[in-house]
């Protein structure tokens, strides 16, 4: 039997983990709503969970060595598994405080695992293609999780009505499989500690103007995306009047289409001019958001939302891959964690703003996001300019 490559073993674990995440996260907002949480409550608790995740990621970057990363990921998976079982138990029991704590732990462990995957892979192989494969694996199998939920929600299976809590149970099963794959993984067992000693990642980044601008770009980009789409399921079910099944099917179809577009873009549809690539990814999104805001039309807003999701997985190699892979391997874990810290700070801010705008009106979610996109696009163009300038000097 042909031996599975080490990096592919990690991707297989990520696939099962992503199915679990996609299935549960798709219904988590509605599960919370069913348990008495308002949209503002939901955005606040997810924002708090994301901010606490930032602290956790900083701890990992400072104290967890590459040689111990596999063990850390395994422990995080187990904690997430036990916590989800507890959330399953808390359903409709009215204990809001315990639910708050459990959701924070759920968000925290999910982010800790997600941020640790690529540093594991870079100990084996590092290039723009494997970076995109890692991202596409996560996106694709999250959509598989959404598919599972969409096929089952509201149906009776062996006499059991599939509701949000049953979907949570199925999510736990996929998470258990990812844990088994992790325990049987031969990859990363004999990693030498390549992490630089006493590394100050902030000082390291500050030495590079390119990386400083990239961090600002990452923060604003995450904030812009989350401001418009931070509460997708609540937006679809409450503003667009989709049923939970219709909302799931919509996200599934658009998500799978986005995965296909991402794969095709990586192989065949990446323009030679990076400025054109950025314009396709973010410029059209900006125009769509502005039209949605000015028109205040529900159909136009849905089209803008759809385009944003469709293009979301495309051109990761251009928008992020270069800046990640420019970093020396011995700084990779620390840098990756710091990058996620910046990104999740932006995401937490965006989700909070999304909750505020959600209460004011749908158009304002997209209008505020369009405002942030102006800065994101400007920084993206400037990054390309700096990158080409560095290449010319070399």
What is the predicted function of each stretch?
Residues 1-5, 187-216:
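Juxtamembrane intracellular "pre-TM" segments in multi-pass secondary transporters
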Residues 2-52, 210-252:
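Helix-loop boundary and gating motifs at the non-cytosolic
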Residues 15, 96-113, 219, 300-314:
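Hydrophobic core of transmembrane alpha-helices in multi-pass small-molecule transporters
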Residues 44-62, 253-264:
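Central cavity-lining transmembrane alpha-helices of secondary-active solute carriers
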Residues 56-69, 261-274, 358:
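Helix-to-loop junctions at the C-terminal end of transmembrane segments
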Residues 78-94, 283-296:
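C-terminal ends and interior cores of transmembrane alpha-helices
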Residues 104-142:
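Cytoplasmic helix-loop-helix junction between adjacent transmembrane helices
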Residues 275-316:
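C-terminal transmembrane helical hairpin of 12-TM major facilitator-type secondary transporters
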């Amino acid at each position: 039997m042909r031996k599975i490559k080490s990096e592919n073993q990690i991707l297989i674990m990520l696939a099962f983990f992503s199915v679990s995440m996609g299935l549960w996260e798709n219904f988590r907002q509605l599960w919370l709503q069913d348990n008495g949480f308002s949209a503002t409550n939901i955005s606040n608790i997810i924002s708090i969970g994301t901010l606490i995740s930032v602290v956790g990621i900083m701890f990992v970057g400072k104290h967890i060595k590459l040689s111990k990363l596999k063990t850390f990921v395994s422990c995080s998976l187990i904690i997430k598994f036990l916590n989800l079982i507890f959330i399953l138990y808390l359903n409709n029991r009215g204990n809001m405080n315990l639910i708050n704590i459990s959701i924070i732990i759920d968000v925290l462990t999910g982010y800790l695992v997600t941020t640790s995957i690529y540093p594991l892979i870079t100990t084996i192989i590092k290039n723009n293609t494997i970076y995109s494969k890692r991202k596409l694996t996560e996106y694709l199998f999250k959509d598989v999780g959404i598919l599972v939920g969409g096929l089952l929600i509201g149906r009776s299976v062996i006499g059991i009505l599939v509701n949000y809590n049953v979907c949570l149970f199925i999510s736990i099963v996929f998470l258990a499989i990812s844990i088994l794959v992790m325990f049987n993984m031969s990859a990363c067992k004999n990693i030498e500690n390549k992490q630089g000693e006493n590394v100050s990642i902030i000082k390291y980044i500050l030495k590079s103007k390119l990386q400083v601008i990239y961090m600002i770009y990452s923060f604003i980009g995450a904030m812009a995306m989350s401001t418009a789409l931070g509460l997708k399921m609540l937006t679809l079910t409450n503003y667009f009047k989709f049923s939970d099944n219709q909302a799931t099917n919509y996200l599934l179809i658009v998500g799978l289409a986005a995965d296909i577009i991402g794969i095709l873009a990586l192989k065949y549809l990446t323009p030679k001019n990076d400025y054109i690539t950025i314009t396709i990814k973010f410029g059209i999104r900006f125009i769509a958001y502005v039209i949605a805001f000015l028109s205040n039309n529900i159909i136009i807003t849905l089209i803008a939302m759809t385009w944003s999701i469709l293009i979301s997985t495309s051109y990761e190699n251009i928008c992020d891959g270069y800046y990640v892979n420019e970093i020396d391997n011995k700084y990779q874990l620390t840098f990756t964690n710091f990058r996620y810290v910046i990104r999740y700070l932006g995401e937490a801010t965006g989700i909070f703003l999304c909750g505020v705008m959600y209460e004011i009106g749908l158009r304002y979610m997209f209008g505020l996001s369009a405002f942030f996109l102006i800065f994101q696009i400007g920084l993206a163009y400037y990054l390309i300019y700096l990158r080409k300038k560095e290449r010319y000097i070399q």
